[in-house]
Amino acid sequence: MKKIISILLLLTIALFALSACGMGKPKIEDYEWKMRTIAHVEGEQLVYDAAAEESTAHPEAKIIEMTLVAKDGKITITDVTNNKTYEGSYTVSGRNPEGTDYNITIDGKSGYAGVAMTTYADGSEEPTLPISLDGYSMYFYAESEK
């Protein structure tokens, strides 16, 4: 169990580090976000949920469509697949040359998020939003600019 929790913690740290790569200073309010992957522990097993386009990278993953919108300190996550909506709030906890960090609360659960440009091996960049919340590591990418 400790090994799985360690792996989940490492994944969360890696997601935050990845999101801090690249240039630009995107903010959570600048985009409409789409979920790429979610990782969490069930029992002693690390479980992935993923967007349909990620199914080849995570063939064991349950396919889920989820979006996130943030504006004026309010955050809404819509789970299109399961017809659920989660609401909460966010505040800026810090800014750096690469992006912005946030404290977030969704449905009474507190966590952390960071928005920055991620640079990939081919040189392409995209705004990314990793979130760590109540044992879940969620990874969103910018679907469209507002």
Sequence positions of predicted segments:
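Sec-dependent N-terminal signal peptides of Gram-positive bacterial secreted proteins and lipoproteins
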Residues: K2-M23
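N-terminal helix-cap/turn-to-beta initiation motif at the start of protein domains
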Residues: C21-T37, G43
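Short, solvent-exposed coil/turn segments at beta-strand boundaries
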Residues: I28, T67-I75, M117-L129, E145-K146
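N-terminal glycine/threonine-rich, aromatic-flanked beta-hairpin/loop signature
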Residues: Q45-P97
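An anionic, turn-rich surface loop/hairpin at beta-sheet edges
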Residues: A51-H58, G94-Y120
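Hydrophobic/aromatic beta-strand elements that line small-molecule binding cavities or substrate pockets
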Residues: E65-L68, G88-V92, Y112-A121, F140-A142
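Glycine-centered tight beta-turn/hairpin loop motif at sheet-sheet or coil-to-beta transitions
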Residues: T81-N83, D107-Y112, L133-S137
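Edge beta-strand at a domain terminus
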Residues: T85-N96, P130-K146
